[in-house]
């Protein structure tokens, strides 16, 4: 049997890269057939899947050299991605096929497991946000716009291969899925904002609570991203977030009205206004201060 090394770099633009015997240094075998004893190098930030006739038969998600042995039982090296990979392999590895030919067809897929950064987003239309302030009894819905960048990571390469990029012939690049992820992310913002609001976080304070927002988005997107595609949000950055001028003014007016309903605060506000008026009068050379004295508004 021959020996060859199949190694493909999973670049930031590539989610999946495939390498097969026909494009390797071993020319003694047939195209898309991996020789027994072949050595496959797996780099840091990569996962490796061996697919035979459209079925996943080997998984290596930790760096090092993997020796392909046709006589061994299917194996899973899950690395730091945990036992969920083994569970997924047990569930799908033996029963999911992708229309492979009856003949022997073997391919090596390299999955990018690094954080994929620089994914921009922006709300084309305002997103509802509930503003709650229990101190003043404020509970009102407003609309906000926001923009920024987020990053994601393929945390379950088996699910990503199975449900997203199965049997690509060359590379599956991020641009093939980015628009779909962005659309689903923007749809998830409203329920994620609801979770943030329940924590008592105001919309203006969200840039300081992006960790909580990323966690809330992962919860909302778990069915479509983590459980279906094996993808999770790593970070969610907010460059800016703002309500409309009308909504901001409405909040200020409601806050002011709530303050004035408090007798103590209302009295303090009146006293402050009187004090300001007296200071202005005292600075008036025409003697307006005497008018305040006559009305009993100047204290000694």
Give the label of every model feature segment:
Residues 1-245, 299:
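N-terminal hydrophobic membrane-entry segments
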Residues 244-300:
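Assembly-interface segments of oligomeric complexes
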